[in-house]
Amino acid sequence: MNMAKQIYYRRRRKEHARQKCNDLLRAMMGEDLVAQWWTGPNHAFDMQTPETVFDKDHERVYAYIMTSVHGEW
């Protein structure tokens, strides 16, 4: 696979992960709090915002949300 396709598919996976994260967050806390969650410091990410961590490692944020969905706060 050429480099352009790899970049395209990587970007699509990240966009898909963001959508899944938002869907799960809306189900857990409601639409009004989702934006606040993304931009507020979070202990799970050493007080970095989930937005900052997602930009570097979207799988880490998705995994954290999935553990929360299953009640592992």
Predicted segments, located by residue:
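Non-transmembrane "mature" sequence context
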Residues: 1-73
